[in-house]
Amino acid sequence: MTTEEKRNVIVRSALSRERKNKYSQDSDKRTRIESGWGDCSGTVWYWYYKKLGMNIGGNTEAQINKGRRVDVAINNGVPDEKNMRKGDLLFFRGQDNSRTDGVGHVEMYIGDGKIFGHGSGVGGTVKVMSEYCRMRQGQKSTEKLKNKGLICVKRYIEDDELTEVNDIVWELAHRGIVSNSDLWVEKLKEDVNAYWLARKTVKYIREHE
């Protein structure tokens, strides 16, 4: 699949369950999306893993620590969407000071100023991004976190030519950096952090040849 096809399949898959799931944080239910359950992080994890074989992390704490931070201006809690792409994830503060940046919720950008996510009740739901972000910004949190506004936008599907796992592994193997290509292909498909490290390694090598 091309980068655009990957982004579209993630969005289409997520939207296929619009208002069809009950909210649950139960570990036995939260990732059973096609069985009618889910929560915010379980929903986005499920589709990335099922459709692309990418393990972006099963909860917001894991997810915010993976992927690449997108360079977006945030004004009054609302991101400038000109640098955003379908499938990007928006992370919001909750009420737990112990988590990375107090992260407590995640939504998926689906294009045209809209986002999709499963917060509570029946979901997931499509929302106008600017309205939702302003609403979160206005919600109080702990004294340390102040509000439940947007923390950052993260990307897991890149839009340059170096996106295919097979291409990355082939180049690393060709240069004698890794052996057992099949094993590395599987590792990079399952581990987003390993994927990004390998990708950065190849990019660095190319730039310094």
Can you say where each PLM-predicted feature lies in the sequence?
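N-terminal capping segments
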Residues: 1-61, 85, 93-96, 100-105, ...
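Short, solvent-exposed alpha-helical surface patches in non-cytosolic proteins
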Residues: 40-46, 162-209
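Catalytic Cys-His active-site segments of thiol-dependent hydrolases/isopeptidases
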Residues: 56-60, 106-136
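Short, structured beta-strand/loop micro-motifs enriched in basic residues and often containing a Trp
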Residues: 64-75
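Short, well-ordered loop/turn sites that connect or cap secondary structure elements
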Residues: 78, 83-84
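Conserved beta-strand and immediately adjacent loop positions that scaffold enzyme active sites
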Residues: 105-106, 169
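Low-complexity, Gly/Ser/Thr/Pro-rich intrinsically disordered linker/tail segments
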Residues: 141-162
